[in-house]
Amino acid sequence: NINEVLNAMNGGCSSMSWTTEDNKHLWGRNFDFNCIAEESKIIYIPKGKSYYGCGTRVENNIVEKTKTVSKYAAVGTGIRLMQSTPILYEGVNEKGVMGGQLAYRCFAKYNDKKAKGTIAVQPPFLVTYLLTRCKSVDEVVDMVENKITLMNIPIL
């Protein structure tokens, strides 16, 4: 049974990227969940859209200091269940930056305290945050290493 194997290995999603002979960049991933939220769909986030990096209106715990505005439009698969912030499972922005959430059971560790000088971001909002704020992989790396703290705050 594949579920028993995955549970024994603490398996998770995978992704891959490659460059074609004509210098195009491709990215793909699998989705290792046996179900996906019914409300999931293709989501477009326009440039100039306000949203939050931490907290939800559904749970009445929005962190106002994390409010931001998208610098770049993005499109991908996701859900708008949280109202205050669209959640992208994966997507691409107008500059060609691509990414996705990869669940890898038992390996992810998040912070209980926000690092000084950073913005708190809940893990489910990370892809949305990076795709709407970064125009290059270098900007993504800088954002993750220096400008945000992934917080250990579950949704729902």
Describe the function of each predicted region.
Residues 1-139, 149-151:
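N-terminal mature-domain region immediately after signal-peptide cleavage
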